[in-house]
Swiss-Prot record:
Cystine residue pairs: none
UniProt protein name: Membrane-bound lytic murein transglycosylase A
Taxonomy, superkingdom: Bacteria
Signal peptide: 1-16
GO annotation, cellular component aspect: cell outer membrane
GO molecular function: hydrolase activity, hydrolyzing O-glycosyl compounds; peptidoglycan lytic transglycosylase activity
Swiss-Prot/TrEMBL catalytic activity: Exolytic cleavage of the (1->4)-beta-glycosidic linkage between N-acetylmuramic acid (MurNAc) and N-acetylglucosamine (GlcNAc) residues in peptidoglycan, from either the reducing or the non-reducing ends of the peptidoglycan chains, with concomitant formation of a 1,6-anhydrobond in the MurNAc residue
Keyword annotations of the record: Cell outer membrane, Cell wall biogenesis/degradation, Lipoprotein, Lyase, Membrane, Palmitate, Signal
Topological category with respect to the lipid bilayer: Lipid-anchor
Lipid-modified residues, S-diacylglycerol cysteine kind: C17
Protein's organism: Vibrio cholerae serotype O1 (strain ATCC 39315 / El Tor Inaba N16961)
């Protein structure tokens, strides 16, 4: 994912029907959905609603991108009017708003929600006995960049690429997965934003998946917290061996502290923006989503909440029936985001007689 701070990601889909599990908020329909996007003449949802952040997020899009404003401003305006006058999804058509339901990986409408956040990690400008793990800027290696293991072994030493030094390996690793992040330099009390600068073009391997396959963390308990707990319980050599299972490495470029932005270049608001697959959800697309609500321990609360969200980011692991919900900045946001691997129903929205009309339409090669 483009402009995020330190991040994480990469999860798979679960399927179900009638008596199948619903512990991750799955819902089962009386019908199956044949396509990725399926025309919905009426949206039926009785979930509690919270549309409070949509107006602010849509305003940031209009202010920040003339091209997206040209396409989406009329739809945003109609959605804001709909929120003021009704907010009932069954009345969308009365405002000229069209909907297409995502079919879900199981063709039952269950769309996977994971979470991401903007971490703030502690760095120092110079290494010492504690802060000794470098965060790197982009090297001039083109397609012959070293692997993670080679970088850990010193392949980039002496090139002046060190942007700062962390107190462990896992914090920079998580920032790499997120794609960007905020850093706090404790030696001069400054806050900087480390934006994504590039990567070494090696294949990404999920360390969460490795931990599950090795039987070190149960699949049902996998989360960012579970990964960090495992890291804290093991020595540096063991942790390093695990991280080296992922040869991919992300490089950063520092900038003054700024609003967190996604790949669309628009500031992101927590619980109002998502990363999605731009082949079916172009940047700026508004969606109506039944977002699963979780308990503090990461289990599903038994409820969903209906929200208006805008797709403003992308990610290598975010494909088709998978959305990555932005949770905000800092440790609490990270804890909440790390719990998310649950399901909800999602509708892509469009406005009749506008560039966004017929949101169910896909190029023939993408129809499934």
């Amino acid at each position: 994912m483009s402009k995020r701070l330190l991040s994480l990601a990469s999860l798979a889909l679960l399927f179900g029907c009638a008596q199948q599990p619903n512990d991750r908020a799955q819902q089962y329909q009386q019908q199956t959905f044949p396509h990725i996007l399926n025309r919905a003449d009426v949206v039926e949802s009785n979930k509690p609603r919270d549309y409070t952040e949509f107006s602010k997020q849509s305003e940031l899009v209009v202010q920040g991108s003339a091209s997206m404003a040209k396409i989406y401003r009329p739809l945003y305006e109609q959605l804001n009017e709909w929120v003021l006058q009704s907010g009932d999804p069954a009345t969308l058509a009365q405002f000229g708003i069209q909907a297409a339901q995502l079919g879900g990986g199981d063709k039952q409408g269950n769309v996977l929600f994971t979470g991401y956040f903007s971490p703030v990690i502690e760095l120092r400008h110079q290494p010492d006995s504690v802060f000794k793990y470098p965060v790197y800027g982009l090297p001039k290696c083109n397609k012959n960049c070293p692997t993670r293991a080679e970088i850990y072994q010193g392949a980039l030493d002496g090139q002046g690429l060190e942007l700062g030094y962390a107190e462990n390996l896992i914090d920079p690793f998580i920032m790499e997965v997120q794609g960007s992040g905020f850093v706090h330099f404790g030696d001069d009390d400054t806050l900087e934003y480390f934006a994504y600068a590039g990567k070494n073009n090696k294949a990404y391997v999920s360390i969460g998946k490795v931990l599950i396959e090795r039987g070190l963390v149960e699949r049902e308990k996998m989360s960012l917290k579970a990964i960090k707990d495992w890291v804290l319980a093991n020595d540096e050599a063991t942790v390093r061996e695990l991280l080296e299972e992922n040869p991919s490495f992300v490089f950063f470029k520092p900038s003054a502290a700024a609003p967190v932005k996604g790949s669309a270049g628009i500031p992101l608001l927590p619980m109002a923006s998502v990363a999605g697959d731009r082949s079916i959800l172009p940047m700026g697309t508004p969606i109506l989503a039944e977002v699963p609500l979780l308990n503090a321990d990461g289990t599903w609360s038994g409820a969903h909440q209906l929200r208006l969200l805008i797709v403003l980011d992308t990610g290598g692991a975010v494909k088709q029936n998978h959305l990555d919900l932005y949770h905000g900045m800092g440790p609490r946001a990270g804890l909440e985001a790390g719990h998310y691997k649950h399901f909800g129903r999602v509708w892509k929205l469009g406005l009749e007689n506008s560039p966004t009309q017929a949101p169910w339409a896909l190029p023939p090669e993408k129809q499934q």
